[in-house]
């Protein structure tokens, strides 16, 4: 995976650093490609969250790989009525708020947290029009 520069984002008064990147799975059935969003709370680099978006998890793959709605080179998920670009700060802000409200606490955690159902999460979260 190519090295990505960390980007800074302010979420509810806290500063986070984040990056996106492409990597390849070692074990896969349909596709080795995956994207990952990594987010750190500033000064808490030992407890990032890694959100994985695996093409392998795309629900359209078993039906017809050629009709897949996941564009790896763009880092976004597209379905009939929305596009979610993982490189947009507004999208990252929604993801950070979601994980802070659920289970991720970077100030008390001592280890990285991995979330492997990124595609499913994107389909469940509400992204306002124009955020991408």
PLM-predicted stretches and their roles:
Residues 12, 19-21, 40-42, 52-56, ...:
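A structural detector for beta-sheet-dominated domains
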Residues 5, 26-28, 40, 85, ...:
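Generic structural signal for short, flexible, solvent-exposed coil/loop and linker residues
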Residues 47-132:
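Acidic, low-complexity intrinsically disordered segments
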Residues 7, 18, 35-37, 51:
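Hydrophobic residues positioned within well-ordered beta-strands of beta-sheet architectures
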């Amino acid at each position: 995976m190519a090295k990505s520069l960390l980007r800074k984002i302010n979420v509810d008064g806290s500063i986070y650093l984040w990056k996106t990147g492409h990597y390849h799975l070692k074990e896969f059935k349909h596709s080795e490609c995956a994207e990952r969003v990594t987010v750190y709370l500033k000064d808490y680099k030992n407890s990032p969250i890694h959100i994985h978006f695996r093409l392998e998890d795309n629900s359209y793959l078993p039906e017809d790989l050629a009709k897949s709605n996941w564009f790896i080179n763009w880092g976004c998920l597209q379905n009939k009525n929305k596009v979610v670009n993982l490189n947009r700060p507004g999208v990252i802000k929604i993801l950070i708020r979601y994980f802070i409200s659920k289970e991720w606490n970077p100030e008390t955690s001592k280890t990285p947290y991995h979330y492997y159902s990124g595609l499913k999460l994107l389909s469940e979260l509400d992204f306002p029009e124009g955020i991408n």
